[in-house]
Amino acid sequence: MIVKKKLAAGEFAETFKNGNNITIIKAVGELVLRAYGADGGEGLRTIVRQGVSIKGMNYTSVMLHTEYAQEIEYWVGDLDYSFQEQTTKSRDVNSFQIPLRDGVRELLPEDASRNRASIKSPVDIWIGGENMTALNGIVDGGRKFEAGQEFQINTFGSVNYWVSDEEIRVFKEYSARAKYAQNEGRTALEANNVPFFDIDVPPELDGVPFSLKARVRHKSKGVDGLGDYTSISVKPAFYITEGDETTDTLIKYTSYGSTGSHSGYDFDDNTLDVMVTLSAGVHRVFPVETELDYDAVQEVQHDWYDESFTTFIEVYSDDPLLTVKGYAQILMERT
């Protein structure tokens, strides 16, 4: 009779039947076969593969062990079994995507039923096995595939990937000074050419607070003709659309400010660090200076939507769910 078993990695398949012929019809890799006689003793232990037949050995039960999770098929009985090579055509197709994060990580687990996997990454990606390593951007034991290049994996073993060692995600870098802006809505800020970028909040962060940060520099000494020791107040902030990028309502997020009680700024670096709670999907972010200082108006005629004394050097996040470098598209075929 033909026996079909679905086994987990390390599992045994045992069949109690008298016979003297055994044929492995379907299997991936090596199996360990044990055959037992009428007295319960082990009459045979050997490694077998797909297509192997053992004839003329009397047994009352057989046991097969696999190192891989897979479906196996075998013949046990007195009659001989005529083996025919199994088709390699796929019977199951599944598509999904994998978030690409920092470090060497698993892309595909070991899967004995996997026939092939077609993969496309939006960023340069290195592919390798369990021995692949990466240190300071140098990858050993992996092959590079260019961004947008589709490639196939035809092995059933585990597959690792590497795209970056960066543990943060930089959304935007700026060299120009931020503009002064009040919360007058998205349309008004865009009409006045306030710089922005879009952030795509994943479903896992829908309504969940996450950290959004910026390295911020304030420099006012001698800028735009301002006196070297003029006191200037600052309060950098993010204005973020409440809904998607077409929503006009903006939410203000800020974490620090300084009133003009000092003798001017000269490369005073700070970190704007806020906890943001947004719905899943795309939101528009405006990094702005919200404090229009009296002296800036009186001495150098600054006004709303002019360049301020504040520069957002880079806006970034170290939240694990936002440090995704992209999503690999995978089409999986199984036998």
From Swiss-Prot:
Signal peptide residue numbers: none
GO cellular component entries: virion component
Keyword Mitochondrion: no
Chief site of localization: virion
Subcellular location as annotated: Virion
Keywords: Virion
Role summary: Receptor binding protein located at the fivefold vertices.
Subunit structure: Monomer.
Comment field on protein domains: The C-terminus is responsible for receptor binding activity. The N-terminus is associated with the capsid vertex.
Protein name: Spike protein P1
Species this chain originates from: Pseudoalteromonas phage PM2
Lineage of the organism: Viruses, Varidnaviria, Bamfordvirae, Preplasmiviricota, Tectiliviricetes
Gene name in the database record: I
